[in-house]
């Protein structure tokens, strides 16, 4: 195979960044360059593309962990490490989305708590606690509802209006 970026490491994703489709490049940037960036704003499309990736990533990780491991400890470790890998970028893009709506950052924490509780309960094999699920689910739904609202169409204290393509 010919190296598409001569002089660069062909196994390094950064060397392929310029050749990626725009939406994949934004997702890659959110995972690497904007990993812990809390400033600025994120548009609706960018936010939902990232969350769709997050759900697919966690589901795939759970399936792989379930089919390849025999012990619950390894399964829990793999799923927890996978969630920790994606938790910070998910939180930061949620914060930037809330900046676009002008809402408090508190609402970005709720989906993370709900996902953590769901993963912990599932991986530890605990029986479902429907009251906790209902409370966390309702709070996460309200949070995602806030993040689904259109942003403020003008520049604000967090930056200029995000560009949606």
Q: What residue ranges belong to the model's regions?
A:
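Membrane-interface extramembranous regions at the lipid-water interface
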Residues: 2-53, 90-106, 144-165
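Hydrophobic alpha-helical transmembrane segments in multi-pass membrane proteins
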Residues: 45-92, 104-149
């Amino acid at each position: 195979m010919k190296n598409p970026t001569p002089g660069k490491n062909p196994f390094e994703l950064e060397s392929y960044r310029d050749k990626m489709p725009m939406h994949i490049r934004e997702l890659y940037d959110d995972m690497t360059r904007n990993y812990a960036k809390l400033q600025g704003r994120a548009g609706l499309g960018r936010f939902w593309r990232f969350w769709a990736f997050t759900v697919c990533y966690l589901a795939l990780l759970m399936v792989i962990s379930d089919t390849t491991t025999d012990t619950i400890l390894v399964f829990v470790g793999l799923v927890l490490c996978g969630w920790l890998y994606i938790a910070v970028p998910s939180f930061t893009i949620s914060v930037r989305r809330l900046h676009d709506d002008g809402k408090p950052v508190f609402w970005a924490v709720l989906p993370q708590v709900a996902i953590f509780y769901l993963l912990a309960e599932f991986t530890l094999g605990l029986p479902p606690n429907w009251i906790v699920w209902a409370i966390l689910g309702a709070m996460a739904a309200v949070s995602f509802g806030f993040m689904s609202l259109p942003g403020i169409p003008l520049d604000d204290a967090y930056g200029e209006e995000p560009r949606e393509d």
